[in-house]
Design a protein with these regions (language model features):
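Rossmann-like NAD(P)(H) cofactor-binding subdomain of soluble oxidoreductases
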Residues: 50, 61-64, 68-137
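Short, conserved active-site loop motifs that form the nucleotide-linked donor/cofactor pocket
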Residues: 53-55
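NAD(P)+-binding Rossmann beta1-loop-alpha1 motif at the extreme N-terminus of oxidoreductases
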Residues: 1-48, 58
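A short, hydrophobic C-terminal helix/tail in secreted or cell-surface proteins
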Residues: 138-142
Length: 142
């Protein structure tokens, strides 16, 4: 999972609840350390207890063995992070955008950016009105 905000943390949490080993990448090393030691994301979701199979990191190369990567990066930083992650992603890795919005220059969708950087990879999108509060509680969205 790329992006340790509320949406990225909730999606990583849901994957961990389903038994997956999850690496949650974020730029903030202190927050990554807090998640690993206290099992909470105090900046965004202080009431959500995270599982032991969810590990946070600020080292982007830690994604190198991932079968699938979900991008939960703000749209204004999406391309920069996608380019930074590119050397650590194999052509077999499934890539999914869970980022809202479009790129400010050119109005590109995030999936278009991924297909430009990773033309051989399978690419998907998670979209729709998914309030973090519903998703965090594993409730169906309305």
């Amino acid at each position: 999972m790329l992006g340790g905000g509320s949406w990225g943390t909730v999606l990583a949490h849901l994957a961990s609840l389903n038994g997956y080993e999850v690496t949650l990448w974020m730029r903030d090393e202190d927050l990554a350390n807090q998640i690993n030691t206290e099992k909470i994301n105090g900046n965004y979701l202080p009431g959500l207890s995270l599982k032991d199979n969810l590990v946070a990191t600020s080292a982007i190369q830690e994604i190198s063995n991932s079968n699938s990567i979900i991008y939960c990066i703000p749209s204004d930083a999406f391309r920069e992070v996608a380019i930074s992650a590119e050397p650590y992603i194999s052509v077999e890795t499934n890539l999914v955008s869970a980022t809202k919005g479009v790129e400010s220059s050119g109005f590109n969708l995030m999936s278009k950016i991924l297909s430009e950087i990773h033309p051989e990879n399978p690419i998907g999108v998670i979209s729709g009105p998914n309030p973090v509060s519903y998703t965090q509680l594993t409730l169906p969205t309305k």
